[in-house]
Amino acid sequence: MSGSGKTTALRLIAGFEKPDSGLIEMRNEIISSDKVFVPPEDRNVGMVFQDYALFPHLDVEKNISFGLSKNEINEGRLEEVLEMCNLENYKNKYPQELSGGQQQRVALARAIAPGPEVILLDEPFTSLDAHMARELRDEVVYLLRKTETTAIIVTHDQEEALSVCDVVSVLENGKVIQSATPQEIYLNPVSQTVANSVGDPNILKGYSVNGRVETSLGTFVSAYDGALDVSIRPECIELTLDSDGSYLVKECTFYGHDQVISFQNSKGEVFRARSLPNTIYEAGDRINIEISE
């Protein structure tokens, strides 16, 4: 979420900023503390910036080779990276002659070239259109796995975080409030903040007695007693058209691959369901619902 400290965390890891307190470890070695500060050039960390930060006066080849020694260039590392990133045909072009996706590929190649132990990516796909972002995202994951390089990616994109990362950490006010696999984050969020950060759940107020919690959408099993917030994902709600149904469709938003239906109960409370577009729902339709736990 915005302002939580994600980009600042990357800059601290890279060594671009010094923390006021605490310590940072890499390879079980302290690289930043009250007494130790390893400079950026000695951390073996690569960085891919949101705005690419390519050198406009250098062509692709020189941008990528910027962090390489003459020996590494002579040993073919430059050509290897150009081929790996599908940039052989662009090596003599300048950044302003490239598309946004090509520029980002060059930025990634420059970060990979020296063989860093960690690559930091600061919202690397936000300036690209949806199709290009997905395509480049897949390429980045492939390259990172191929080179066996650890990466830390900062993103606001929920789909990007869940599809790219092995471990997702959700930050709030500079603190990690949950760090787990994408599946665990999505299915078992530890708080409403986490639930909202990876989807658009329906948050229902309820009160649980003897392991059963009553909500506006029915009764569910609970591991706890007392007042609770119950999170129900829109895709867990199945709708059925019924002229005598208990719920009223207010709006249907079509996305192509699926649709989001807003509906309300007799009290006027509004909820969201997500379904395949094979059934058409219109405002005013009566429906019944079934929720999969």
Where are these regions (language model features)?
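ABC ATPase nucleotide-binding domains
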Residues: 44-46, 54, 59-193
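A position-specific signal in ABC ATPase nucleotide-binding domains
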Residues: 17-18, 25, 69
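C-terminal boundary and immediately downstream tail of ABC-type ATPase nucleotide-binding domains
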Residues: 187-209, 231
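Non-catalytic connector elements of ABC transporters
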Residues: 212-293
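Conserved ABC transporter NBD signature motif
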Residues: 22-33
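Helix-to-loop junction immediately C-terminal to a conserved catalytic motif
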Residues: 14
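ABC ATPase nucleotide-binding domain helices that frame the ATP-binding cleft
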Residues: 7-10, 106
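Walker A (P-loop) phosphate-binding loop of ABC-type ATPase nucleotide-binding domains
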Residues: 1-5
